[in-house]
Regions:
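Helix-to-loop junction immediately C-terminal to a conserved catalytic motif
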Residues: 49
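Conserved ABC transporter NBD signature motif
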Residues: 57-65, 72-73
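Conserved ABC ATPase "signature" region
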Residues: 97, 101, 108-126
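Conserved ABC ATPase signature
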Residues: 130-134
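Conserved catalytic motifs of ABC-family nucleotide-binding domains
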Residues: 151
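Catalytic Walker B motif of ABC-type/P-loop ATPase nucleotide-binding domains
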Residues: 155-159
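Short, charged/small-residue-rich alpha-helical element at the C-terminal edge
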Residues: 223-229, 234-309
């Protein structure tokens, strides 16, 4: 269930918030939406969620048109805005039951589903607590439960980790990865690029309402792309490998013809496209007799790319 966007445009007055945007987001993956304030990210998400009409262009969300099929899109999409926005006097359970009813869920099925979602986001102890006493991070978790109440096939998340503590952010990453592996299409916007880097399969860079051209060294993420619609950019992350014997590590990297960069302590850095490639490299090193001490991705690749792109556009 993918997302396809073609020549999408939306004006506010004379100012284009989104301008002739082409984009294709594959199903069963987590795709990040990255850009500065005012780039059009939230406007795009609102149009995808059938909450804002475009001025021109076409959108398909799970094969549905948000303009002509808004109710069907609302059933297929789980929408989590960056602000909670709900009735503070209602309890967490009552809020989820209200949204379940709005989605047409049977009352007998809605209550156990609501309790299941509260448990999923670790708010089961707050089931009877009014929303007004929740912290910002707890409200974010409740917002995620609300977006998931009707088991959507597409998730649209605007700053989902805002206000969350480190444990909650780690839980969010794990949950989104599990949902994607089950086939859910996830598109999320965030300014916390270090967090996004840990969970996304691909990235769409936006600036001035449109998608930015591919940065050097980045490739298209796997998955079908619509005609003329660029796919998200695949994360080509840099990993660091360290071994007990730096010489043997270097020999293995040379014999395997890997494009590595050696560090002063004998560790090496090398580009890794995905987890499967990382597993293959680790297995190859161990099979070659390299006693690997550590092998992990370096953070900051996404932020460096974002800053470089913004620097070029200025």
């Amino acid at each position: 269930m993918s997302i396809e966007v073609s020549q999408l445009t939306r004006f506010f007055g004379r100012a284009p918030a989104v301008h002739q945007l082409d984009m294709s987001v594959p199903g069963g993956a987590v795709t990040g939406l990255v850009g500065p304030n005012g780039a059009g990210k939230t406007t795009l998400l609102l149009m995808l969620a059938a909450l804002l009409a475009p001025d021109s262009g076409t959108i398909r969300v799970a094969g549905l048109d948000p303009v002509t099929q808004p109710r069907e899109v609302h059933r297929a999409v789980g929408w989590m805005p960056d602000a909670f926005g709900t009735w503070d006097s209602l309890t967490c359970t009552e809020i989820l039951l209200t949204f379940a009813a709005a989605q047409g869920m049977n009352a007998d099925a809605a209550r156990p589903r609501a309790l299941e979602m509260l448990s999923l986001v670790h708010l089961e102890e707050m089931a009877r607590t009014p929303a007004r006493v929740l912290s910002r991070g707890q409200k974010q978790r409740l917002g995620l439960a609300r977006a998931l109440i009707h088991a959507p096939t597409v998730l649209l998340l605007d700053e989902p980790a805002a206000g969350m503590d480190p444990r909650s952010r780690a839980d969010l990453r794990a949950l989104l990865r599990d949902l994607a592996s089950g086939g859910t299409t996830i598109l999320l916007s965030s300014h916390i690029l270090s967090e996004m880097e840990e969970m996304v399969d691909g990235v769409v860079f936006m600036s001035h309402g449109t998608a930015v051209a591919s940065p050097p060294g980045w490739g298209e993420a796997p998955g079908p792309a619509g005609p003329g619609a660029p796919a998200p950019l695949r994360m080509q992350r840099t990993w660091r490998m360290r071994a007990l014997d730096a010489g043997r590590l270097g020999q293995w990297a040379h014999s395997a013809q890997l494009p590595v960069t050696a560090e002063q302590d004998g560790a090496v850095r090398l580009p890794v496209a995905d987890d499967a490639t990382a597993a293959r490299l680790l297995r190859g090193a161990v099979d070659a007799g390299v006693e690997v001490v550590s092998f992990a991705p370096l953070s900051g690749t996404l932020e460096e790319t974002y800053l470089a792109l913004e620097g070029e556009r200025r």
